C-alpha cells in the first residue's frame, strides 16, 4: 500500500475545502462555464462505458466443472469447492463470473496498470477477478481449495518456466496524527482508493508454470473477489531516473484537488513490444502553467526505455488527447530527473477509444 504523510493529506483536504468554498460562491452560470467543473465525472463515465465486463457461467458445485472464456482461458473447479460465508458446503447450481484483463487497452479502461506497489514494472500474462454466487448469496472457496486456470501463453522476453503470482491492492493507507477527546495524542490509519488503479504485491508462495504440452500458463486462484495476476518483473539493468510529464494545455486543475477517485487528466506509458502499462498518477506539486502534470516513482524509469505515451484529459464534457512515441532520456546537467511535454488536442469519444486500443500494437 502506498502511504501518504499527514502533511500531504492536509494539503489534499485543504484543496478540496477551498474548491468547495469557491463553488458555493459562484453562480450557476459561472459554474457551467468552468472548464474544470466536472470533477472527473466525464472521464469516469467514459472509462466505465468501455471497461472489461464480467462473463458468467453456470456450474454444478457438487460435481465440479470446467468452462472456457471468450479469450480461450480455461477454468477448472473441483467438486465441492464452494461454501457460504458462514462455512456451509454448497451444492447445486452456482453462477461463476470472471473478469479478464489481458491487454494495455483493457488495463486503461479497467484501471489496472501493471506496476508493483513499490514502482517496479511488470510484464503481464493476465489479470483476473473471479466471484461466485448462489441466488443472492455470495460464496467463497473452502480453505485450502483453489480453482485452476490455464491461459494460452508463451514465454516473453526470456522469461523462464516460473512466473510469480500477484495480489492486487487498490487502496492507500493514510496516517493521521492528532488528539482525542481527552487531549491524548493518537495516530490513526485510514484506507481509501487511489488514482493508481491498483498496486501489485507478490504472493511469495504462489507461481504460474508454462505447460509445454498444451501451450498454456497454468496457475491456481485460491481466493474469490480479489484481483490476481501472473506477471513477470521486467528485468532492465539500465540506470533508473525520475520522469516528469508536463501538460502544455488542457490540464484539468481538479486532477490536483483529490487523491481519491478518477482523474480527469491522466498520463500513460506503454513500453514498446511488451505487454505492460505504466500509469503516472502522482501529480506534480506546486506546479503552475505548463509545469502541471505527473511524476513517476523516484528513480523507477529505466534510461533508454522506448515506448508510447498517451496523455488524456476531459474539460467541460470534451475529450482531449495526444499520443507520441518517446524515450526515457538521461537527466541533463545537474538535474536528477528527465521530462517530456504534452499538448492534448480535442478528439471525439470514438477517437479516444481508438487511441487507447492502438496501444495494444505498440
What are these regions (language model features)?
Residues 1-10:
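Bacterial N-terminal signal peptides that target proteins for export
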Amino acid at each position: 500500500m502506498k502511504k501518504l504523510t499527514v502533511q500531504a493529506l492536509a494539503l489534499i483536504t485543504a484543496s478540496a475545502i477551498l474548491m468547495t468554498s469557491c463553488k458555493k460562491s459562484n453562480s450557476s452560470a459561472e459554474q457551467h462555464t468552468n472548464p474544470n467543473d466536472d470533477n472527473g465525472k466525464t472521464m469516469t463515465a467514459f472509462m466505465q462505458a468501455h471497461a472489461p465486463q464480467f462473463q458468467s457461467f453456470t456450474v454444478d458445485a457438487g460435481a465440479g466443472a470446467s468452462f472456457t472464456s471468450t479469450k480461450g482461458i480455461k477454468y477448472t473447479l473441483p467438486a465441492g469447492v464452494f461454501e457460504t460465508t458462514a462455512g456451509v458446503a454448497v451444492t447445486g447450481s452456482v453462477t461463476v463470473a470472471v473478469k479478464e484483463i489481458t491487454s494495455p487497452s483493457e488495463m486503461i479502461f479497467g484501471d489496472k496498470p501493471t506496476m508493483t506497489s513499490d514502482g517496479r514494472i511488470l510484464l503481464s500474462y493476465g489479470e483476473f477477478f473471479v466471484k461466485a454466487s448462489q441466488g443472492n448469496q455470495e460464496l467463497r472457496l473452502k480453505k485450502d481449495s483453489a480453482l485452476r486456470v490455464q491461459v494460452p501463453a508463451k514465454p516473453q522476453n526470456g522469461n523462464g518456466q516460473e512466473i510469480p503470482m500477484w495480489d492486487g491492492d487498490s487502496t492507500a493507507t493514510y496516517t493521521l496524527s492528532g488528539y482525542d477527546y481527552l487531549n491524548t495524542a493518537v495516530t490513526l490509519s485510514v484506507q481509501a482508493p487511489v488514482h493508481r488503479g491498483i498496486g501489485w504485491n507478490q504472493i511469495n508462495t504462489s507461481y504460474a508454470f508454462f505447460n509445454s504440452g498444451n501451450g498454456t500458463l497454468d496457475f491456481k486462484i485460491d481466493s474469490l473477489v480479489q484481483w490476481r495476476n501472473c506477471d513477470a518483473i521486467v528485468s532492465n539493468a539500465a540506470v533508473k531516473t525520475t520522469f516528469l510529464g508536463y501538460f502544455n494545455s488542457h490540464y484539468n486543475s481538479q486532477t490536483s484537488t483529490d487523491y481519491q477517485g478518477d482523474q480527469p487528466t491522466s498520463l500513460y506509458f506503454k513500453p514498446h513490444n511488451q505487454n505492460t502499462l505504466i500509469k503516472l498518477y502522482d501529480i506534480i506539486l506546486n506546479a503552475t502553467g505548463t509545469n502541471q502534470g505527473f511524476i513517476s516513482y523516484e528513480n523507477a524509469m529505466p534510461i533508454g526505455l522506448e515506448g508510447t505515451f498517451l496523455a488524456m484529459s476531459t474539460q467541460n464534457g470534451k475529450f482531449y488527447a495526444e499520443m507520441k512515441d518517446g524515450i526515457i532520456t538521461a537527466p541533463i546537467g545537474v538535474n536528477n530527473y528527465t521530462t517530456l511535454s504534452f499538448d492534448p488536442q480535442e478528439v471525439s469519444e470514438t477517437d479516444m477509444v481508438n487511441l487507447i486500443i492502438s496501444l495494444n500494437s505498440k
